Each structure stands twice: as structure tokens, then as C-alpha cells.
Swiss-Prot record:
It comes from the Eukaryota. Residues 1-20 are annotated as: Disordered. GO terms for molecular function: DNA binding; protein heterodimerization activity; structural constituent of chromatin. Residues 1-14 have a biased composition (Gly residues). GO terms for cellular component: nucleosome; nucleus. Belongs to the histone H4 family. This is Histone H4-1. Pfam families: CENP-T_C (PF15511). The nucleosome is a histone octamer containing two molecules each of H2A, H2B, H3 and H4 assembled in one H3-H4 heterotetramer and two H2A-H2B heterodimers. The octamer wraps approximately 147 bp of DNA. InterPro entries: CENP-T/H4_C, Histone-fold, Histone_H4. Keywords: Chromosome, DNA-binding, Nucleosome core, Nucleus. Signal peptide: none annotated.
Length: 98
């Protein structure tokens, strides 16, 4: 009955174990700095300076895009009955976005 040892995979865990608390993160989108957005624009082919309103709009669009990618990646993971999101899940989610 050897087995590999280690923790069990799909069990319920310890009796009476607490659920892991997930920290609520707010305003992390401001971590996408103005110079970072400018570099992305340069890489995308923009040559002129950007208007001040562009930065907030870019942050909002990026946030929505990433939320959709993460949602799709998690959906792929759940469908495969896994708990870990793999790089392939993210690749498939990105391909689905277009």
C-alpha cells in the first residue's frame, strides 16, 4: 500500500479547519503608473504625448480585460476539477479574448 506520501489531494482537510481568509484589495489599479501606461502606448505605436484623461480610462479598460481573462482561466480550472490555475489555462483564456 506504499503510495507517495504527502498530503491528500481531494479530501476535506482537517476537521474543524478554518477557511483561509482572503484579503480584499482596493485601488490596486493605481499601481499601473503613468509611465507604465506611456511605455505600453509607445510599444503600441503611439508617438505623441497622451492626454491626462487617457490614463484613468486605460486603467479601467485594463482592469476589465484582466478580470475577464482571470474569470475564464478559473472557469477552465474548475471544469478540469483542479484547484490550481495553470499557465495553459491562462493561455486558453487569452486566446478566447482575441
Amino acid at each position: 500500500m506504499g503510495g507517495k506520501g504527502g498530503k491528500g489531494g481531494k479530501g476535506l482537510g482537517k476537521v474543524g479547519a478554518k477557511k483561509r481568509h482572503r484579503r480584499v484589495i482596493r485601488e490596486n489599479i493605481q499601481g499601473i503608473t503613468k509611465p507604465a501606461i506611456r511605455r505600453l502606448a509607445r510599444r503600441g505605436g503611439v508617438k505623441r504625448t497622451l492626454s491626462g484623461l487617457v490614463y484613468d480610462e486605460t486603467r479601467n479598460v485594463l482592469k476589465v480585460f484582466l478580470e475577464n481573462v482571470v474569470r475564464d482561466a478559473v472557469t477552465y480550472t474548475e471544469h478540469a476539477r483542479r484547484k490550481t490555475v495553470t499557465a495553459l489555462d491562462v493561455v486558453y483564456a487569452l486566446k478566447r479574448q482575441g
